[in-house]
Amino acid sequence: MQFFPPLQRATLIQRYKRFLADVITPDGRELTLHCPNTGAMTGCATPGDTVWYSTSENTKRKYPHTWELTETQAGALICVNTLWANRLTKEALENDWLSELSGYSELRSEVKYGAERSRIDFMLQAGFQPDCYIEVKSVTLADHGQGYFPDAITQRGQKHLRELMSVAAEGQRAVILFAVLHSAITRFSPARHIDMKYAQLLTEAQQRGVEILAYKAEISAEGMSLKKLLPITL
């Protein structure tokens, strides 16, 4: 999936109020960007890092520029816009790039399900096969090649795992897909040191039939695609 119009480059001054970031452009202009990431963004928002941002044609937006990528001083590329996790997953599903999830004829998004009134990111259907429920999570937390999720305690994420376990218990196919949006990550694990309950639930979910996948995006300032399967350690 290509960025269009092309992204523009700047240098990060600071991120603040969770949703805002100040940057300076190569020609010396200071801009305030919208930051579409409510997480801790550990390692993704260091002052001095290169930022790649998009610009909306919507003239009514208070902040027309959106922070899309971080290029760290070590050279790693990170997609900080969490909306891309679902966009890339949808593109990969539509093109059968994820072999474990191929062979379905219908793809639906944001389907209501479960006792806790959740919405599943994607549902795959085909003939008389069990429906396939897919929950997508964006992974950007990295430590020496190891990717982790979550980067903060997530009650919502815990709820999604409980819902997926219920889906599996009903005989449907339940999948949690970790979309790794950090070029330096080579393997994935749940972040026990941050949210032990989530890590325990993920292990329990696997034992109860929930499938766990981690796919890494190829990232550049021109575009991204989700194609590479990564090893997982629970």
UniProtKB/Swiss-Prot annotation:
Positions of the DNA-binding region: 201-220
Superkingdom, taxonomy of origin: Bacteria
Gene Ontology molecular function terms on file: DNA binding
CDD domains recorded: SfsA-like_bacterial
Pfam families: SfsA (PF03749), SfsA_N (PF17746)
Keyword terms: DNA-binding
PANTHER family: SUGAR FERMENTATION STIMULATION PROTEIN A
Task performed by this protein: Binds to DNA non-specifically. Could be a regulatory factor involved in maltose metabolism.
HAMAP family attached to this UniProt entry: SfsA (MF_00095)
Family: Belongs to the SfsA family.
Protein name: Sugar fermentation stimulation protein A
Organism: Escherichia fergusonii (strain ATCC 35469 / DSM 13698 / CCUG 18766 / IAM 14443 / JCM 21226 / LMG 7866 / NBRC 102419 / NCTC 12128 / CDC 0568-73)
Lineage of origin: Bacteria, Pseudomonadati, Pseudomonadota, Gammaproteobacteria, Enterobacterales
